[in-house]
Every structure is written in structure tokens, then in C-alpha cells.
Amino acid sequence: MKSLLVLLAFFSAAAFAGNAFGQFLNQWRFQFYLLSLLVMFYALFNRFFLYSFLALLLLLLNFFVVSSSVPVLFSGGEGKGKTAFGMIYQPRPSSLLDIFETADRRRADLLAVIDPVLNGVSPSGLVPAGYHLADNDEGKSFMVSSRPPRSAGRIGLGGGRSAAFVSLEIGGRGYVFLSFDLSGMSRRNKEKALGYVNAFVAAEDDPVIIFGDFGMTAWSPAFGRFLASNRLEVKNDLFSRFANLLMPPTQYVVGYRNLEFAGSRRLPSLGNRSAPSLIRLKI
């Protein structure tokens, strides 16, 4: 146990370094927090009170770093949302028919299809009845909405990636929904892509709601600067996020202060490599 605590302390401290090694360790802080929690309870159970106290210090250190950018235990939002709104996020699908049927079956208000592999298939001919293809089908990211879109389009993110956005009227006012997938991009390209997203958000008059895979943890420096520059918040807590708890969390819902995150769950992947995620909000 002593060796484990020494390693945890070293990794937790080294994660503050600005070099590549420090940034690599920094993305694992949530796992350091979980491991410190387990060590603390194990030490308490075996009456190793000094080790338990040291584990508590490491737990608090990593907790405060993580919670500075993302809710850890409870989702964000002030509980003022009145309209329930369901979204499905599907990165890089190869079977549009499966994801369209899933959206229809789940009665999703919005479907984000990010960087699809179309193989010559046109989305416009597969859109379920009662849904609207928010933009043309050029083989890039797009949105499908149950509400008539006010406007829609894409943002080039570099590296062949694109973000899809759509403006919808909900409860008498406009909201802009933006979705993308930055996973697998280099750190430099991720930061460039966030710069493009930042410029888009800054130019919008209506509240912007962002959901997808940022390819980095919310407490990373680049993500922190992005949130601060737009006064946005991460809304989903880490225990309800739609990814593996044993891996660094990179999938988030980001929005304005009053936006309420109601929950999320992973859905069956069916004919696609990546499983879609169902996200529920109150707007």
C-alpha cells in the first residue's frame, strides 16, 4: 500500500507539469481520484489510519482539479429547464438506416451524425417521417431534427473533420446545437479545432449547446481556456457520462448556466462501429 500511495502522489504531482508527460498524466486525474478513494476505504477498513489520511489528501487534490471544470458527482444546471429535449450523438456511422431508425424509435428531438461513412448512400432518402434533414447531404457531418430548422450548416475543423450545427426554436426562443468528434486528432489539431469552435460560439447571438467528443479532458488547459472564453459550463457529471469509466473522459455536454442535464446512456451500436449516445436535457 505504501508503494501505491507513493506512486499516486508522484503521478498526481507530476500531472501539474506543462510538458507532454505531465499532460498525459493530467488526463488520468479522474482515475487517480477513484483509485485514491478505493485506497482510502481499504486503509480505513484495515485500520491503517495514516495511509487513509494520505489517500484522502490525494483524493481531495485530484477531486478539486477535476471538479474545477466538470461536475464529478452531480450534473450541472440550476433546474430551471422546462422543456424536455432528447438528442442522439452518433460519430462516424456506416449504417445510416440503423441510426435513423434508432432516433425514430427513441423519439429523439435531434440526431447528430458526425463524419459519416456514406459509401454513396444519400441521407435525404432515409430520413424518417416527421424529421427534417437540417442541411444538404454532402457526405459530411449533419443534423436531423424533429423541429423545422431555422438554419443549419457545418464548420471545418481541419484534418477532414467537420462539426454540424443547427438552430432551432424551443419555447419561443432560438438555440444553436453544435456537435463534433475530435477523438484521434493530434493535440495541436484538437486545439486548432477548438479555436474554430470558439470563433463560432463567439459569433452566435443565441445560446449554444455543444455535445460530442472533445478528444481531451475538461480539466486540460486548452479546454479550460475554451470554457472561460465563452462562459460555458460542462453539464454532465462524470458518473453519468456516456463512456468507459476506466478511460479518461472526453465526451461532454457543454452549455449555458441554466441548461439542465437530465441524463445519458449508450445505445446499441447495431450496424455501426461506434455506439450512439442518447442525451436528455431540460431547456
Label the predicted regions:
Residues 1-124:
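N-terminal, active-site-proximal structural segment of metallo-dependent hydrolase catalytic domains
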Residues 92-105, 115-283:
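Soluble catalytic domains of enzymes that build or remodel membrane lipids, polysaccharides, and related
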